[in-house]
Amino acid sequence: MPSEAVLGQELLDERRTETRRYKLRFPTREALEASLAIEAVGGAVAVALPERRVISLDVPAAQVSFMAESFEAARQHYGAEIVEDYRYSLEQLDFYNPLAFAPEGEAQQSLDDVIEAIGAPQAWSHSRGEGVVIAIVDTGIDGLRPEFPHYKRHPRSWAANGEDPWTDWQGHGSMCAAIAAGTRSQGGEFDGVAPDAMIMSCRTHFYDTELAAIYDELTSLAREGATVIASNSFGVQSGSPPPVPADSDFIPALDDAIAAGVIVCFSAGNYHHLAGGTPDGHEPNSIWLHKGRSDLLTVGAAKPDGSMWYYSSRGPGQFPGQPLTSPKPDLVGITPPFGRVVYGSNVSVLKDGWGTSGCCPQAAGLIALLQSKRHAEDEPPLSRDQLFDVIRKSSVSLGHHGHSQGAGRLDCEAAVNRI
């Protein structure tokens, strides 16, 4: 297994076994600010959301019992409500397992082949993503990789307190960033779908409060006039419908970002087989929670030969027919078996492809191409609904049920030519 994956597993294990994350919600912002003294008695503030009256604390396992008194004081003196901070799962295909990786010599296709297959090079004569920000909400991005030169890094990239957004604790975020918007311009091995787009690294361990802080920042950028696209490859790893997370700050922050004009893409999930689905089947549903919303784009995974991956989550979504939902997935990207791609600080070969995680940033890159073309032509950006309509109508059907492929495989050239 590549060293970054080993390191990522070690860091994840350390976080799970040595710390716990708690969310404290206060009745007023003043109460929150007055309570921050509790940090000195065992808990370190990971995220502060003053406007939402919330902080989250990392508490070492050995200190949890000692923090009980401080938590009780926060309840009594400041009116705090205290719960464990909900954590989503990284959308990954057991990338911690050495068997998920293959030797370099076994590579069948690479990111270059995928970029060609989805028509990105043909679209570059019209647009390469300039003037658009793609936020990669993931495990961070390895700033040592030449695909991510300094001139492409957004200055408001985000990480929790004490962390660097341009480091990658697992490798997954670097993969997604390279697919969406990597560049060869400074010696990188690959171009992504939108090689001239700005990249905003949003490094997270997928806690609710971290995601809320990220989306609050994206909201601010959009309100300031930036064209922002968010690529998200996290969810709930389950073969059955999960309960809706209680007391979420992420979902209201997501609502605010979408209302401000942030265009949001999500991986459909890698759970079809966990739900008991067969490789060729289009049921049962395994697209969970907010990924069924009509105001975001949900992306599944197909192989280069047009067949569906056995793991790609099928629709129509957890809450079909309810208000503000639509049948999912919206479309699919391509990920090859034994596919060669950036992963952390290395270029690695992944036996079962890159998951729906590797397809979501393809869609984010396509949206960047579309919005960048509008900008270059001095035209206003397309609305969310216009973008989604163009992308769906230009997609190429692979002959599968809509619950598997949505509208089909994205086609960058056809989409750019459609506007």
Where are these regions (language model features)?
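Subtilisin-like serine protease catalytic core
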Residues: 122-155, 163-210, 225-227, 259, ...
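Hydrolase catalytic cores
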Residues: 180, 200-204, 335-405
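Short glycine-/aliphatic-rich beta-strand segments at the starts of folded cytosolic domains
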Residues: 8-26
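Active-site-proximal beta-strand/loop segments in catalytic clefts of secreted hydrolases
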Residues: 26-27, 85-86, 137-140, 179-183, ...
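Autoinhibitory propeptides
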Residues: 3-4, 12, 32-114, 121-122, ...
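Extracellular S/T/G-rich loop segment that most often corresponds to the catalytic His/Ser-adjacent loop
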Residues: 138-140, 146, 286-372
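Substrate-binding/access-modulating region of protease and related hydrolase catalytic domains
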Residues: 183, 202-295, 326, 345-361, ...
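Anion (oxyanion) recognition and catalysis
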Residues: 39, 76, 128, 255-259, ...
